[in-house]
Amino acid sequence: MEITKEIFSLIAAVMLLLGSFIALISAIGIVKFQDVFLRSHAATKSSTLSVLLTLIGVLIYFIVNTGFFSVRLLLSLVFINLTSPVGMHLVARAAYRNGAYMYRKNDDHTHASILLSSNEQNSTKALQLRAKKREEYRKKWYQND
């Protein structure tokens, strides 16, 4: 009985350690990435996994060492894993609709067709026109505040 308790405590500790490591990677990604879409990806995907691993580790620890099952931990686990991706999706969608800057690794626009509408045909002039319209929209939008 004592050996299984130690094994489960070790599993809980490893899950807590993995969750902390993934949260650190998420924080580095939030600081390092260039635009709102990459940052939201880093904030959502890895932090959701880190919270999942951390709460499962805490749940295992409480079950093994105290002998009770925490419904609060289970509910918080479900709540965070449902609301975090949905909330960040809404933030990214609002940023896209407001014309937020999208990071491109290089200036070659031949592979950027997914970011453009079909009538722009991936031309540099069309991208510049789109950026100019976006800047005019931003100036108009933020001057009224």
Swiss-Prot record:
Tell where it localizes.
Cell membrane
Gene Ontology cellular component annotations, sorted alphabetically: plasma membrane
Question: Which stretches are transmembrane?
Answer: 11-31, 51-71, 72-92
Keywords annotated in UniProt = Antiport, Cell membrane, Ion transport, Membrane, Transmembrane, Transmembrane helix, Transport
Q: What is the top-level taxon of the source organism?
A: Bacteria
**Pfam families with a match to the protein in the record:** PhaG_MnhG_YufB
Q: Name one GO molecular function term.
A: sodium:proton antiporter activity
Predominant place of localization: membrane
Membrane topology reported for the UniProt record: Multi-pass membrane protein
InterPro entries noted in UniProt: PhaG_MnhG_YufB
Subunit-structure text: May form a heterooligomeric complex that consists of seven subunits: mnhA2, mnhB2, mnhC2, mnhD2, mnhE2, mnhF2 and mnhG2.
Which protein are we looking at?
Putative antiporter subunit mnhG2
Q: Which gene encodes it?
A: mnhG2
